[in-house]
């Protein structure tokens, strides 16, 4: 039987976590979480990381791999993930990848091979001192192709692209080869019509569960200038702590930023993947039917 990789993809707040757990229970496999922020310990509420109860319902992997001040690059992540994918397939189980981080999903499902350059701590410190705006401008001049794919407010990926450029003398775009995986890939997509309402509900839940307190803990431990604390949710919570926003204003801004991000995610998935889009009301049944057909 040809090994099978199942991707459950979709924008944030689309219901991927619940579907992933249900599929893992039905298929007797693990959930491999493909989320670029859930990799970090202590970033639980703001990333909507599966709760302790959800992790007891199905075993989750690729969570809490590092601390927020020790970034994991794409090559390191793929190495961790590939080991787990091979373990699942060797046991005769589908590798179940669940997440919304498009580049990570693309790398694993389409064989994108990122440069194997270890993090350059000294260079990263220099880049952080320059500031994100300056770094993205530098990248735009040196590697326009990479800059076009990276959001101007994404310091982690911007710094990594510059790190590869200065560390190897070649652009990251020129080093991203492809080696398609030796397995069948089934892509299942979620894109509910009420996504905006779901985002607003989830954002309210994050703040009610203690997003501001979690952000305060992280900023005390790692510093308020930590790049990951500038991302959606944490950036607004920092503004609350600094007195620049009320919590209600921060919640509204987080919802807006999340909605814009979700729209970009949907565009990415439509352009780079060809998923079977599932009906939200019957997603589990449709997913199981598609998986059974792919395994036959």
Swiss-Prot record:
One of its GO terms (molecular function) is tRNA dimethylallyltransferase activity. GO terms for biological process: tRNA modification. The record marks 101 as: Interaction with substrate tRNA. ATP binds at residues 10-17. InterPro entries: Dimethylallyltransferase, IPT, P-loop_NTPase. Residues 35-38 are annotated as: Interaction with substrate tRNA. It is an enzyme of class 2 (transferase). The keyword Cytoplasm does not apply. Keywords: ATP-binding, Magnesium, Nucleotide-binding, Transferase, tRNA processing. The keyword Amino-acid biosynthesis does not apply. Substrate binds at residues 12-17. Its EC number is 2.5.1.75. Pfam families: IPPT (PF01715). It catalyses: adenosine(37) in tRNA + dimethylallyl diphosphate = N(6)-dimethylallyladenosine(37) in tRNA + diphosphate. Its cofactor is Mg(2+). Belongs to the IPP transferase family. Catalyzes the transfer of a dimethylallyl group onto the adenine at position 37 in tRNAs that read codons beginning with uridine, leading to the formation of N6-(dimethylallyl)adenosine (i(6)A). Monomer. PANTHER family: TRNA DIMETHYLALLYLTRANSFERASE. This is tRNA dimethylallyltransferase. It comes from Synechococcus sp. (strain RCC307). The gene is miaA.
